[in-house]
From Swiss-Prot:
GO cellular component, one term: cytoplasmic vesicle
GO BP of this protein: chemotaxis; inflammatory response; mRNA transcription by RNA polymerase II; phospholipase C-activating G protein-coupled receptor signaling pathway; positive regulation of cytosolic calcium ion concentration; positive regulation of epithelial cell proliferation; positive regulation of ERK1 and ERK2 cascade
Membrane topology of this protein: Multi-pass membrane protein
Upper taxonomic lineage: Eukaryota, Metazoa, Chordata, Craniata, Vertebrata
Modified residues (Phosphoserine): S314, S317, S327, S332, S334, S338
Cytoplasmic side: 64-68, 132-152, 227-242, 304-350
Function: Receptor for the chemotactic and inflammatory peptide anaphylatoxin C5a. The ligand interacts with at least two sites on the receptor: a high-affinity site on the extracellular N-terminus, and a second site in the transmembrane region which activates downstream signaling events. Receptor activation stimulates chemotaxis, granule enzyme release, intracellular calcium release and superoxide anion production.
Residue positions with a glycan: N5
Record topological domains on the Extracellular side: 1-36, 93-109, 174-200, 266-282
SUPFAM superfamilies xref list: Family A G protein-coupled receptor-like (SSF81321)
Protein name: C5a anaphylatoxin chemotactic receptor 1
Length: 350
């Protein structure tokens, strides 16, 4: 079996091109591939947009999180994205240095794994938010009696705990490795005696738990939600529903290439032409997955401008409007919110 002791992992940021047979084995300078250069440009854009954007969302939602369920959801999503964005400069430096990793073993285990933690945390949080939307529409009595900030924080803690458990393989298998040709220290994935079997198992679990299962369940959930919304057109606000749907769709769009490439690299033999082709495209797929870390603030701003009908709102005010709980119009009677914990907000906002 190929790569029995040290196998390629498609989250291995330091291995961009090092498995290519054309890689020089002496000390000659090798130029970065075009796909890697494009990936680096994307990383820069993600960092420049994602750090201030998510930090602003964290600031706005943290002020409302004690009393607003929606703010709790969006706060946790922003924290997950912000953690991944903050790790980008170190990963960027490693790629520029052709995979050299001078940051030590602990950083090797943690920093490249943050994108996987982000993936699992984001999809589990989105599933939790979707369940909240579903219950608000189909079980309003339960919401009136039970829904609150305490339960929302508990659900988020469970989501983060599960995400950490699912990221454990990446933490455990990542090690600092010594390359001989050319001599350098790299941060790689070593499956040891388990070899290809472990690599394939990790990739399959990642695909099923992190993509296919959520795609199916959320598709069913939002099909019912949208059908109910359309059948009662004009009876309730759909602001939050539209924002959440946009966030969910963007997640699956930007993570799809990563998941497809991961399965190709896990299942095919390294000597195959398709594998070598996948190695070249892999940096771009990883970069696209990182785009998901900066896209949510953009969605919130675009949605806020659409809902406000004006462009003069300050960003904090605009975000606060988009991410707050909603007032409800039911029939001809308007229920205005004095706080986000009113019965109308709890049981009718979609």
């Amino acid at each position: 079996a190929p790569m029995e002791n040290s196998t390629y992992d498609y989250t291995n940021y330091d291995s961009l091109g090092t498995l290519d047979p054309s890689t020089p084995v002496d000390n000659t300078v090798r130029r970065l591939r075009p796909t890697t250069i494009v990936a680096l440009v994307i990383y820069m854009a993600v960092f420049l947009v994602g750090v201030p954007g998510n930090a602003l969302v964290v600031w706005v939602t943290a002020l409302e999180a004690k009393r607003t369920v929606n703010a709790i959801w969006f706060l946790n999503l922003a924290v997950a994205d912000l953690l991944s964005c903050l790790a980008l400069p170190i990963l960027f430096v490693s790629i520029i240095q052709e995979g050299h990793w001078p940051f030590g073993r602990a950083a090797c285990s943690v920093l490249p794994s943050l994108i996987l933690l982000n993936m699992y945390a984001s999809i589990l949080l989105l599933a939790t938010i979707s369940a909240d939307r579903f219950l608000l529409v189909f079980n309003p009595i339960w919401c009136q009696n039970t829904r609150g900030a305490g339960l929302a924080w508990l659900a988020c803690c469970v989501a983060w705990g599960l995400a950490l458990l699912l990221t454990i393989p990446s933490f455990l298998y990542r090690k600092v490795l010594q390359d001989d040709y050319p001599p350098k220290t790299t941060c790689g994935v070593d499956y040891g005696h388990e070899g290809v079997r472990a690599e394939r198992a990790v990739a399959i679990v990642r695909l099923v738990v992190g993509f296919l299962l959520p795609l199916f369940t959320l598709s069913v959930c939002y099909t019912f939600l949208l059908l109910r919304t359309w059948s009662r057109n004009g009876t309730r606000s759909t602001k939050t529903l539209k924002v959440v749907v946009a966030v969910v769709v963007s997640f699956f769009i930007f993570w799809l290439p990563y998941q497809v490439m991961g399965m190709i690299l896990a299942l095919l033999h390294p000597s195959s032409a398709t594998f070598r082709w996948a190695i070249r495209l892999d940096p771009l797929c990883i970069a696209l997955a990182y785009v998901n870390c900066c896209i949510n603030p953009i969605i919130y701003v675009v949605a806020g401008k659409g809902f406000q009908g004006q462009l003069r709102k300050s960003l904090p005010s605009l975000l606060r409007n988009v991410l707050a709980e909603e007032s409800v119009i039911q029939g001809s009677k308007s229920f205005s919110r004095s706080t986000v914990d009113t019965v109308a907000d709890k049981c009718q906002a979609v």
